[in-house]
UniProtKB/Swiss-Prot annotation:
It is a multi-pass membrane protein. The gene is mpc-2. GO terms for molecular function: pyruvate transmembrane transporter activity. One of its GO terms (biological process) is mitochondrial pyruvate transmembrane transport. This is Probable mitochondrial pyruvate carrier 2. Keywords: Membrane, Mitochondrion, Mitochondrion inner membrane, Transmembrane, Transmembrane helix, Transport.
Amino acid sequence: MGPHRLLYQALCKAGDKFVYPVLPAFAKPAWNHAAGPKTVFFWAPTIKWTLIGAGLADLARPADKLSLYQNSALFATGAIWTRYCLVITPINYYLSSVNFFVMCTGLAQLCRIAHYRYQNPDWETKEIMETHN
């Protein structure tokens, strides 16, 4: 058994001993849920929220500096995984919600890119000139 596994088990035991007793009655079932905070099904989406933060931060960037491919990938994977999270067992609404917002941030950026390119028909020429200078 690796040291990371021992650390994880020790943290779960400490949580069961110190956190679980002080939880309100409505939160206790969530603590031991199959997608609760003692599983990767909780922590993976929690960490994935940073993608939404990055997408929101990109709203401050000029649309001509956004990547069409990156935002297409965020939109597509967000859509696919949102659906998948609703058909797996256990159904993971938390993971589904984070993927839904990944899809939304990707879509918002794709709309910004499309709007920029529509408003600036010579965008491709400008891009080529900037890369050669």
